């Protein structure tokens, strides 16, 4: 049964979330080096060993994509179209605005937005195939305008291949694990070198992304999935169902409920046991519930949000809008009793590729911005440069960079006067 703990137990939960990457890094280092040195030859060996590849290339033929697409049921196609429409709509909301405006006479500042050239999406296919992750990683890239989108999946899952074809993805590779990350990071004759690799994966995928972050852009290093729910008087059946929905992902997943009500805590614990009885994924979910999950009793909902901010959960469920202003750190927030986390996993629109293990303190989920470069632009008139010349040359010479100062003076004919320096602020303001 799930543990019911006092809020003072939160530090123990935080300590147990540390990603176990050190051992995995030792395993993947030789794989990365082999792919870097030997390219396709090493990649094929690993793909045959780990990914059940039975062909002479990791590239999936277009005919296979078309065949998989033709085999999709109407129900599945409709589900993809519904989810894709919302994912695309949300991604469009995130596109940065291009601008160029005059901030002072003759000085124009702005930015232009450009997509990355090549992006690789990693789609896990271990315990569960994830066509939803294909949509979450590919659609924002399409909205961003990335011209070359590649997909890697360890197995030829019909739903993944068919969804790729529905979305118009043409370059799909049957490869997984660290070898797939290395292939995209270094490039081979078959696999193009990517500017950025996105998408979740096993601990070995995470370790490979971490080690190669200096050679290729990545989204973030993701650990086991997690949800934190805050509720004082929610429906026990709903809360238990949401916790199990997270727990069934992985034995290392974490589901945490923070509540002010001991009665609710006991009711949810009982509901979890009842719902586990006929859950097909109970073997996995039960281990996650027993090992990494808990119901914690707090004094107030305000304390619950404070603890949540310390935890910085991947998914955060709160009862209503009143707590949202207090939320500082979360990958994605679900508000109200009908905003189940499963909606975000599949079809509501916001991305489900989210930071875990406290990384939500630093960033949110995968977004269009991960596929774009925002390039600053500036235009100065002769008069604007003359106005800024005293500041530029003074700062340049203070740093010992005389050529910088002269590059201004050669255009302005020397300094056009000096402004009276401001006094330094005093301690009392």
In which residue ranges do the predicted regions lie?
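N-terminal Rossmann-like NAD(P)+-binding subdomain of aldehyde/semialdehyde dehydrogenases
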Residues: 1-117
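Conserved small-residue-rich beta-alpha loop and adjacent elements
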Residues: 101-163
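Alpha-helix C-terminal capping segments
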Residues: 136-147, 165-167, 185-191, 209, ...
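Conserved NAD(P)+-binding/catalytic subdomain of aldehyde/semialdehyde dehydrogenases
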Residues: 168-254
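A conserved active-site cap/scaffold subdomain adjacent to cofactor or substrate pockets
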Residues: 220-291, 295
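C-terminal core of ALDH-fold dehydrogenases
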Residues: 301, 306-419
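Short, low-complexity intrinsically disordered segments enriched in A/P/G/S/L with frequent Arg
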Residues: 423-424, 429
């Amino acid at each position: 049964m799930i543990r019911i703990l006092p809020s003072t137990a939160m530090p123990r939960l935080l300590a147990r979330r540390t990603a176990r990457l050190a051992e995995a890094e030792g395993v993947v280092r030789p794989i990365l080096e082999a792919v870097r040195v030997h390219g396709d030859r090493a990649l094929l060996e690993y793909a045959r060993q780990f990914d059940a590849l039975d062909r002479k290339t990791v590239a999936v033929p277009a005919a296979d994509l078309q065949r998989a697409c033709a085999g999709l049921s109407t129900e599945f196609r409709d589900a993809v179209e519904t989810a894709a429409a919302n994912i695309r709509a949300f991604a469009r909301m995130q596109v940065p605005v291009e601008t160029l405006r005059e901030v002072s006479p003759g000085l124009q500042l702005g930015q232009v937005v450009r997509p990355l050239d090549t992006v690789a999406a990693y789609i896990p296919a271990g315990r569960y195939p994830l066509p939803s992750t294909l949509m979450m990683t590919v659609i924002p890239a399409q909205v961003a305008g990335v011209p070359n989108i590649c997909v890697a999946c360890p197995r030829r899952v019909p739903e993944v291949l068919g969804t790729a074809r529905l979305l118009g993805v043409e370059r799909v590779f049957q490869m997984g694990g660290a070898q797939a990350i290395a292939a995209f990071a270094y490039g081979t004759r078959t696999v193009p070198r990517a500017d950025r690799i996105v998408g979740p994966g096993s601990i070995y995928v995470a370790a490979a992304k971490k080690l190669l972050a200096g050679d290729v852009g990545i989204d973030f290093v993701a650990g086991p999935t997690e949800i934190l729910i805050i509720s004082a008087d929610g429906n026990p059946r709903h809360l238990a169902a949401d916790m199990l929905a997270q727990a069934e992902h992985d034995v290392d997943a974490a589901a945490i409920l923070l509540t002010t009500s001991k009665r609710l805590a006991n009711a949810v614990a009982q509901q979890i046991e009842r719902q586990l009885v006929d859950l097909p994924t109970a073997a996995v979910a039960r281990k996650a519930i027993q090992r990494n999950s808990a119901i914690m009793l707090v004094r107030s909902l305000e304390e619950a949000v404070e603890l949540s901010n310390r935890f910085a959960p991947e998914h955060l469920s709160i009862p209503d809008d009143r707590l949202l202003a207090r939320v500082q750190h979360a990958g994605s927030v679900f508000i109200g009793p009908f905003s189940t986390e499963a909606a975000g996993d599949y079809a509501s629109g916001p991305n489900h590729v989210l930071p875990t293990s406290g990384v939500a303190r630093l960033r949110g989920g995968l977004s269009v911005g991960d596929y774009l470069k925002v390039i600053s632009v500036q235009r100065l008139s002769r008069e604007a440069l003359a106005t800024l010349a005293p500041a530029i040359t003074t700062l340049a010479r203070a740093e010992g960079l005389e050529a910088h100062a002269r590059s201004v003076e050669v255009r302005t004919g020397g300094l056009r006067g000096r402004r009276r320096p401001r006094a330094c602020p005093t301690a009392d303001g």
